[in-house]
Regions:
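Extracellular or exported targeting regions of proteins
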Residues: 19-196
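N-terminal signal peptide c-region/cleavage motif recognized by signal peptidases
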Residues: 13-15
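Positively charged n-region of N-terminal signal peptides that target proteins for export
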Residues: 1-4
Length: 196
């Protein structure tokens, strides 16, 4: 009985640690207005290969003075498997976990409420969105809906929409972890905040 109670308390503690983040959909270039009064941003990109012909894209830029998010750092991510090909077996990625640390909240979609994560579903590339974004400690796990899959021929696979968060910390390199159906989790070079 005591061990059952202990297990129950452990499960409750684990569940209490997981924190769902608020996700909103936005369009480009309108989202840029949160980060620059001119509604234009200059970005830097990092690419990490996935299964030879796919990649994880990390995008980073600093919000400009005079913008709602002035002084913060913007991090956007995208998984591109459009050219990952399978004939009898189509590989896919179900989630991406990044050691992000604390994120800053802003009104990304103009409804007056503060949000955690934005997904650029209009005005940009992609066809796969987010099912959820869940924080556990410093890690955030982004689960895709549906999974991001390769295709039966080049150009027939999926790409996620760009999805992003904001932090008060500048970037450093981290190893992101992508859960998939082809074997052990993929460990991918990415940018994320250099938080304490």
């Amino acid at each position: 009985m005591k061990s059952l109670l202990g297990i129950s308390l452990l499960l409750l503690a684990s569940a209490a640690v997981a924190q769902p983040l608020k996700i909103v959909t936005v369009s480009a270039p309108a989202i840029n207005c949160v980060f620059n009064p001119t509604c234009k941003v200059t970005v830097q990109d990092l690419s990490a290969p996935i299964w030879t012909n796919g990649f994880l894209q990390s995008r980073n830029y600093k919000a400009a003075a005079g913008a709602p998010a002035a002084g913060t750092y913007v991090y956007e991510y995208r998984i591109d498997l459009r050219n990952v090909v399978g004939v009898t077996f189509i590989r896919f990625i179900t989630s991406l976990k990044i050691n992000f640390g604390p994120n800053a909240r802003f009104d990304f979609n103009g409804d007056g409420a503060k949000d955690d994560v934005f997904v650029v579903t209009a005005g940009g590339i992609g066809n796969v969105g987010l099912l959820s974004a869940v924080r556990s400690g410093n890690d955030i796990t982004f689960t895709f809906k549906p999974p991001v899959a390769g295709g039966s021929a080049p150009g027939k696979g999926d790409s996620t929409f760009f999805f992003g968060l904001v932090s008060k910390y500048p970037r450093h390199n981290v190893m992101a972890v992508a859960a998939n159906n082809a074997g052990p989790p993929l460990v991918l070079n990415a940018w994320a905040p250099n938080h304490p």
